[in-house]
């Protein structure tokens, strides 16, 4: 398969480092870390490969007051990024796989192996030394996570939370919440160290921790390039 990519006129320039892969992503630190992770995986197979990154906002980045359960399985966190590919500005887009809409606007050419599927409940720092209140304020961005929290904390107040990982942690440390839910994969990718956190029990999102790569033209060719890092069980 690798020899096919090196000999294919559509792919050989990328594999040999003669042209950069033009990658689109959101402009958060997490999104950029995901791009570097994906390219690092590819470079294990194509050492000369390099890339140029274009970042942009999506509707979800701009509209931070809309509860996420109202826009699940939509283009909320992919529209602006995929638009760069549609316009020909970029060759590929890299997304958190769980952000993909039910019907993606571009062909999905690969989904990477899950880094970690779990959710973390991250506590405000002072709860290292004291118990949570009887009715803790718990920040969650999905119905699935909220249902798990309700089981663990029947008297808890489940409050919506939005923003980047850094913005959510800032809200936690400024006292807006007693604890918040984050994807463990996000913490790992950003090398975050929480003073006190616990891993929540399942269910987890089926694609949490995986990355999705979308393309417009030559989708079959791109699938060949990404075959070494595509997880066939995803």
Curated annotation (Swiss-Prot):
Pathway: Porphyrin-containing compound metabolism; protoporphyrin-IX biosynthesis; coproporphyrinogen-III from 5-aminolevulinate: step 2/4. Tetrapolymerization of the monopyrrole PBG into the hydroxymethylbilane pre-uroporphyrinogen in several discrete steps. Transmembrane segments: none annotated. It catalyses: 4 porphobilinogen + H2O = hydroxymethylbilane + 4 NH4(+). One of its GO terms (molecular function) is hydroxymethylbilane synthase activity. It comes from Chlamydia pneumoniae. Belongs to the HMBS family. This is Probable porphobilinogen deaminase. The gene is hemC. The keyword Transferase applies. Its EC number is 2.5.1.61. One of its GO terms (cellular component) is cytoplasm.
């Amino acid at each position: 398969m690798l020899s096919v990519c090196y000999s294919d006129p559509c792919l050989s320039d990328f594999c040999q480092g003669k042209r950069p892969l033009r990658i689109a992503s959101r402009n958060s630190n997490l999104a950029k870390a995901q791009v570097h992770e994906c390219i690092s995986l590819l470079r294990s197979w194509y050492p000369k490969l390099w890339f140029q990154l274009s970042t942009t906002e999506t509707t979800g980045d701009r509209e931070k007051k809309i509860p996420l359960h109202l826009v699940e399985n939509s283009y909320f966190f992919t529209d602006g990024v995929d638009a760069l590919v549609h316009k020909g500005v970029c060759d590929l887009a890299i997304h958190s796989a769980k952000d993909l809409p039910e019907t993606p606007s571009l062909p999905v050419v690969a989904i990477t192996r899950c880094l970690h599927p779990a959710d973390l409940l991250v506590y405000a720092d002072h709860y290292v030394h004291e118990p949570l209140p009887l009715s803790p304020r718990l920040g969650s961005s999905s119905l699935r996570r909220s249902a798990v929290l309700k089981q663990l904390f029947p008297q808890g107040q489940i409050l919506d939370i939005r923003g980047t990982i850094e913005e959510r942690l800032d809200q936690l440390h400024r006292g807006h919440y007693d604890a918040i839910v984050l994807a463990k994969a996000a913490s790992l990718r950003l090398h975050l160290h929480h003073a006190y956190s616990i891993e929540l029990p399942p269910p987890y999102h089926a694609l949490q921790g995986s990355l999705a790569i979308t393309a417009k033209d030559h989708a079959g060719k791109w699938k060949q390039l990404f075959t070494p890092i595509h997880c066939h069980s995803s």
